[in-house]
Structure formats: structure tokens, C-alpha cells
């Protein structure tokens, strides 16, 4: 077994099973490029402050870049005996450049090193996810633009309530994604702070320049307290919270896609490129994409809860428990990324809205009942009185097997003399939707304005 960096303190050797249990190289290799970036910045800072010579710093940088090339070429594959990515890099660096490689860890601990790596990693992944959110929003917006006057039943309690523009429905998810995009931007700012130079917990005796290394790494600032710097995982928890919300939004949309694709709704058809079949039932076309997204949402939420529980009992400063933050974080990042990609593809090419069925759906129920009450209220009838009257109309119409549009004018006027011929136009699905022209409503003019506003939001960086 490879000699541990810290083994001179001990007389015995580490039990192989404990070494395996302790090792994180199997998953923290994900951080290697960020570990190399942090080490390069640290080496340059050591030279700038006179702790090592410029020539030594150059050797360190060259060695670290060689490790990067080896990793990218698939030639750097440290085993579990290397313990973690930090030791693996340091050991390989020393093989490449000799004893000068042993100087890299001057004025640095693995505690501030890993904190730096994770922040660099998460900063990059946040940028990636924000772009994926933009791609998702762009497809939603494209669908909305082509379906302003396509109507779909709107629901409360999963019961038909009022018809809405399909574009209006899609834009609701656009706004959810917009909040997700904004939220990640705020979290990025709090992630973009450097703990490098905090040492193990108390800082260092060397005359380092933390601001210089932070500047080299693109951080906006440095932690003001070394204890906080090495022990803080607020940024990871905040990210997992934001990731959970993204998955909640995708899961809600997925649930609707699953319902809409069912024979009972039949609002959409699934294309062959985004559906699968059954191993036993030849007629089936299954909505696997939204079902998987719905399932993966719980996985990400579990990571959030796990991280909160992980942190709740940790005294300052660093504890080995924090090794457990990475697998949850890495998996949540990848799950959000693939889920956004899959949903974007599904919306772009995987579904077709069944226009005839949607038109039937908004015309076959009593979702225009509120408009009858509004009609009477506009003619001076107190709304609550109008509401009660229309409730009775719906009850008697159901008993007679009629819809509101089937009532004769005489039947309307027998209910209340305020009804006139224009009641029929007022309760058509198109008019019901068009009339809701309040700001943020489903009226066609409002939806067109919302699309224009969404385009402006999409151009934000």
C-alpha cells in the first residue's frame, strides 16, 4: 500500500478495510481539474510572496499542467490507495518535478484546499445549469408563441375550472424557470468566495496573499474568518435547495405531461423519439421521460435533507463528516443537468398537442359558469346573488343533460330577466379566455405582452 502523507506520526499501518472506508478518490476525482486550478494559483501566490522562488513556481505549474493532460488523456487513474484527489495530485507532482513538488502544500491544508475545489466546481456547474434553464425556457417560449389562441382546460383540485390559453399555461413554467435562474445567480455570488489560505482552521504563519490567489481563480472575495472558511457548506445547501426547486418545477410539468398523454385526457401525443414501449403489451407507448424526471425529483430532495442533517451537529471547524457532502452534491448536479436536457428535448420534439381534442375539452363542460356570474354582475346583479343563481343553473342543466350553451334564451330569461342574446357570445371558450385581460391574466393580449416580456427576460445574462 502507498505510504500515507501522514504515516510518520503512526507506528502501525492502517487496516485495509479502514483505508478503503476512509478513501474518497473514487468520487472526488471529479474535482481534479479544479484542484489543479487551485494548486496552480496557490503556487503562483507562494512565488509572489517570496515563500518559494519563481523558478520553483514555474516547475510546479508545468507539473500540474502535465497532470491535467495525463488526466484528460485517460492516463492518470489513481487507485484507492491514494486516499483522495489532493494526495494523488501531490504524489504525482512530486514524481514529475521532484522535491519541489513537496513545497506546494506550504501554507495550505486539505481543509481549505477541498473547500476551494468544491466552490470552483459548483460555480462552473451553476453556470452550466443556468444555461440549461435558458434552453428550457427558449423551448417553452417557442411553444407559447405558436399556441396563444390554443385553449386548454385550466384546473383547480384537478377539476376543470376555467379555460386558459395554452401559451399562458406554458408561460407559468417559464416564470418558474426564471426564478430558478435568478436564484442560482444569487447562490453563485455566495459560492464565489475563496477559503484558500484559511489553512486547517486558524490561518497560517506564512506571509501569504489570499486576495491574489482569489483573484487568479476568479473569486469575488475571500472568507473573512478562517474557521468559517473551512467549515462552511451553506453554499452547497443553498444549491441543493435551488436544485430541489428546479426538480419540483420539472416534476410538476412531468406530472401534467403524464396526465395529458393518457387516454383519459388525450391532450398530447408522444412521438417515437421520446417514448418507449412495453415488454408485454404491444399497444403501449409509455411516457418514460416525464416519469423518470418525476422520480429523480425525490432523489435530489433527499440530497438536500441529507446535507442539512450532515451539517446540523458539526462543531467548528473541519470534520471528516464533510467528506460526505460531495457525492450528494455531484449527483444532484448531474441529475438536474440531465433532467433539464431531457425535458427540453421532450418539449421540443417529443410531444404534439392534439388541437381537436383540446377544442372539444374546453367546450364540453361548465368551465364558463364563472362568466355567467360575471355577466350578471356587469348588469348590476350583486355577484354573490349571481353566483348562487348560476350554481342552481349548473345543477339543473346537469340533471337535464345540457351544457350552458344549450339553454334557450327563454330558459335563460326565466332564470333572470337580465339575460339577453349576447349571453351566448359571452360564454364561448374563446370569449371566456379573451375577456380575462387583467395584467398577468390569460387574455390573448395579455399573453402576447407576457411573451414579449419573456423574450426580454431571456436576453438577460
From Swiss-Prot:
Optimum temperature is 45 degrees Celsius. Shows more than 35% enzymatic activity in terms of relative activity at 20-50 degrees Celsius. Inactive above 55 degrees Celsius. GO terms for cellular component: cytosol. Its main location: cytoplasm. It comes from the Bacteria. The keyword Transmembrane does not apply. Pfam families: ASL_C2, Lyase_1. PROSITE patterns: FUMARATE_LYASES. The keyword Lyase applies. Pathway: Amino-acid biosynthesis; L-arginine biosynthesis; L-arginine from L-ornithine and carbamoyl phosphate: step 3/3. InterPro entries: Arg_succ_lyase_C, Argininosuccinate_lyase, Fumarase/histidase_N, Fumarate_lyase_CS, Fumarate_lyase_fam, Fumarate_lyase_N, L-Aspartase-like. Transmembrane segments: none annotated. It is found in: Cytoplasm. GO terms for biological process: arginine biosynthetic process via ornithine; L-arginine biosynthetic process. Strongly inhibited by L-arginine. Inhibitory effects are lowered at pH 7.0 compared to those at pH 8.0. At 45 degrees Celsius and pH 8.0, activity decreases to 94%, 74% and 37% in the presence of 0.6 mM, 2.8 mM and 10 mM arginine, respectively. Activity also decreases to 86% in the presence of 10 mM sodium succinate or sodium citrate. Activity does not decrease in the presence of 1 mM or 10 mM L-lysine, which has a similar structure to arginine. Keywords: Amino-acid biosynthesis, Arginine biosynthesis, Cytoplasm, Lyase. Optimum pH is 8.0. Shows more than 35% enzymatic activity in terms of relative activity at pH 7.5-9.5. Signal peptide: none annotated. Catalyzes the last step of arginine biosynthesis, the conversion of argininosuccinate into L-arginine and fumarate. A mutant overexpressing this enzyme grows faster than the wild-type strain under photoautotrophic conditions with 5 mM NaNO(3) as a nitrogen source. In contrast, the growth of the mutant is similar under photoautotrophic conditions with 5 mM arginine as a nitrogen source. HAMAP family: Arg_succ_lyase. Belongs to the lyase 1 family. Argininosuccinate lyase subfamily. This is Argininosuccinate lyase.
Amino acid at each position: 500500500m502507498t505510504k500515507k502523507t501522514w504515516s510518520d506520526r503512526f507506528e502501525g499501518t492502517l487496516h485495509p478495510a479502514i483505508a478503503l472506508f476512509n478513501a474518497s478518490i473514487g468520487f472526488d476525482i471529479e474535482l481534479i481539474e479544479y484542484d489543479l486550478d487551485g494548486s496552480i494559483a496557490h503556487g503562483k501566490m507562494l512565488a509572489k510572496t517570496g515563500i518559494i522562488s519563481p523558478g520553483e513556481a514555474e516547475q510546479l505549474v508545468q507539473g500540474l499542467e502535465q497532470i491535467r493532460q495525463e488526466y484528460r488523456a485517460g492516463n492518470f487513474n489513481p487507485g484507492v490507495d491514494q486516499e483522495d484527489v489532493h494526495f494523488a495530485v501531490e504524489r504525482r507532482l512530486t514524481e514529475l518535478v521532484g522535491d519541489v513538488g513537496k513545497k506546494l502544500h506550504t501554507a495550505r491544508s486539505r481543509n481549505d484546499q477541498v473547500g476551494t475545489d468544491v466552490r470552483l466546481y459548483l460555480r462552473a456547474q451553476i453556470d452550466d445549469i443556468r444555461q440549461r434553464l435558458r434552453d428550457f425556457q427558449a423551448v417553452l417560449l417557442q411553444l407559447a408563441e405558436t399556441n396563444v389562441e390554443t385553449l386548454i382546460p385550466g384546473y383547480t383540485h384537478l377539476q376543470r375550472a376555467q379555460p386558459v390559453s395554452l401559451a399562458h399555461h406554458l408561460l407559468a413554467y417559464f416564470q418558474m424557470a426564471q426564478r430558478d435562474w435568478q436564484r442560482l445567480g444569487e447562490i453563485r455570488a455566495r459560492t464565489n468566495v475563496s477559503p484558500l489560505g484559511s489553512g486547517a482552521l486558524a490561518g497560517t504563519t506564512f506571509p501569504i496573499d489570499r486576495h491574489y490567489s482569489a483573484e487568479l481563480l476568479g473569486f469575488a472575495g475571500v472568507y473573512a474568518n478562517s474557521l468559517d472558511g473551512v467549515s462552511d457548506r451553506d453554499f452547497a445547501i443553498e444549491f441543493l435547495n435551488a436544485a430541489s426547486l428546479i426538480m419540483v418545477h420539472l416534476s410538476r410539468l412531468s406530472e401534467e405531461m403524464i396526465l395529458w398523454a393518457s387516454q383519459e385526457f388525450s391532450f398530447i401525443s408522444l412521438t417515437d423519439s421520446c417514448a418507449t414501449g412495453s415488454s408485454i403489451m404491444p399497444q403501449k407507448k409509455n411516457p418514460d421521460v416525464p416519469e423518470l424526471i418525476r422520480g429523480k425529483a425525490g432523489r435530489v430532495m433527499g440530497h438536500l435533507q441529507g446535507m442539512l442533517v450532515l451539517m446540523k451537529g458539526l462543531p467548528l471547524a473541519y470534520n471528516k463528516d464533510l467528506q460526505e457532502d460531495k457525492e450528494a452534491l455531484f449527483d444532484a448536479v448531474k441529475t438536474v443537468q440531465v433532467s433539464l436536457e431531457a425535458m427540453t428535448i421532450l418539449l421540443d420534439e417529443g410531444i404534439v398537442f392534439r388541437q381537436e381534442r383540446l377544442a372539444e375539452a374546453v367546450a364540453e363542460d361548465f368551465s364558463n359558469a364563472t362568466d355567467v356570474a360575471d355577466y350578471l354582475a356587469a348588469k348590476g346583479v350583486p355577484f354573490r346573488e349571481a353566483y348562487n343563481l348560476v350554481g342552481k343553473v349548473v345543477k339543473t342543466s346537469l340533471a337535464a343533460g345540457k351544457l350552458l350553451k344549450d339553454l334557450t334564451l327563454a330558459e335563460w330569461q326565466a332564470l333572470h330577466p337580465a339575460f339577453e342574446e349576447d349571453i351566448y357570445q359571452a360564454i364561448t371558450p374563446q370569449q371566456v379566455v379573451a375577456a380575462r385581460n387583467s395584467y398577468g391574466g390569460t387574455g390573448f393580449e395579455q399573453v402576447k405582452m407576457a411573451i414579449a416580456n419573456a423574450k426580454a427576460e431571456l436576453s438577460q445574462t
